């Protein structure tokens, strides 16, 4: 397995992360990227994204509040990413409730590129064609067969797939990881999943093994959440403490404290 200095390599490069994300959590995504050591750019105008992707280190597309303009921008951005060898992270927020989002994902896979799909367990199982329980953008799924869903979807799109829940699951279609860190308080802060998607983009920007980089991003969020909860047990103060702890997180800490089972 590749040397696991994922965070160190990311911070040495300060990667430019181009985000086309939802309006609910755009500020949170920008701030957590800055705290993590990356440089965020929240550029979504469809007549600007093609050129901007070409100078970016990674592209993060979040489908949470998908408008027609964002849809056009997302497809153009994914084409530019393919042409300029820029890794792409997709967060299919709410895809079981709004089927148009699946069409957008398939279009990006057809004409552009997808390197990582990161969603909650309900979203990932839905995309994999498995039975799942969701309510709006939230998963009600207990995680059964989640790694199988990740593996199937990874093979379908030839990418890394991560499914988040009480446990988190990552697969590249052959290898996998199961992560057992985290705190329930992460579910009480809107945008925790969106922020995680941004971290996945940051860690994959300059790291070849994207199964490892995605696992590192999830560990970073979960362990920062655990540490934040030690200091702040209420949602507002927890949110601030989470960003503070992302700023202080390190490779040594995530791999020593991380409860990861490699498959």
From Swiss-Prot:
Which residues of this UniProt protein bind substrate? 42, 191
A GO BP term, please?
Answer: thiamine biosynthetic process
Query: Gene3D superfamilies under this entry?
Result: 3.40.1190.20
Annotated metabolic or biological route of this protein = Cofactor biosynthesis; thiamine diphosphate biosynthesis; 4-methyl-5-(2-phosphoethyl)-thiazole from 5-(2-hydroxyethyl)-4-methylthiazole: step 1/1
Q: Which SUPFAM superfamilies match?
A: Ribokinase-like
Which InterPro entries does the entry link to?
Answer: Hyethyz_kinase, Ribokinase-like
Enumerate the residues binding ATP: 118, 164
Origin, by domain of life?
A: Bacteria
Keywords from the named record: ATP-binding, Kinase, Magnesium, Metal-binding, Nucleotide-binding, Thiamine biosynthesis, Transferase
The molecular function terms in GO held by this entry are: ATP binding; hydroxyethylthiazole kinase activity; magnesium ion binding
| Job description of the protein | Catalyzes the phosphorylation of the hydroxyl group of 4-methyl-5-beta-hydroxyethylthiazole (THZ).
* Similarity comment: family membership: Belongs to the Thz kinase family.
Any idea what this protein is called? Hydroxyethylthiazole kinase 1
* Species in which this protein is naturally found: Clostridium botulinum (strain 657 / Type Ba4)
Gene it is expressed from: thiM1
């Amino acid at each position: 397995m590749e040397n696991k200095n994922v965070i160190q390599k990311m911070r040495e490069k300060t990667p430019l992360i181009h985000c086309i994300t939802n309006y609910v959590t755009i500020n949170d995504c920008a701030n957590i990227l800055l705290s993590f050591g990356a440089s965020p750019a929240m550029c979504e105008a469809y007549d600007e994204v093609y050129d901007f992707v070409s100078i970016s280190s990674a592209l993060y597309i979040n489908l949470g509040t998908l408008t027609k303009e964002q849809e056009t921008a997302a497809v153009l951005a994914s084409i530019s990413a393919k042409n300029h060898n820029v890794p792409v992270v997709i967060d299919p927020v709410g895809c079981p409730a709004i089927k148009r989002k699946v069409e957008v994902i398939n279009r990006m896979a057809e004409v552009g590129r997808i390197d990582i799909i990161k969603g909650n367990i309900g979203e990932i199982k839905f995309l994999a064609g498995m039975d799942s329980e969701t309510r709006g953008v939230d998963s009600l799924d207990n995680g059964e067969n989640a790694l199988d869903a990740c593996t199937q979807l990874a093979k379908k799109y030839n990418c890394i797939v991560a499914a988040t829940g009480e446990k988190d699951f990552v697969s590249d279609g052959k290898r996998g990881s199961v992560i057992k860190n985290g705190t329930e308080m992460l579910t009480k802060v809107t945008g925790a999943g969106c922020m995680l998607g941004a971290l996945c983009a940051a860690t994959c920007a300059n790291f070849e093994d994207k199964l490892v980089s995605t696992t590192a991003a999830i560990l970073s969020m979960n362990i920062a959440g655990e540490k934040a909860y030690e200091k702040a047990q209420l949602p507002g103060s927890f949110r601030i403490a989470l960003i503070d702890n992302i700023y202080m997180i390190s490779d040594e800490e995530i791999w020593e404290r991380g409860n990861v089972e490699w498959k």
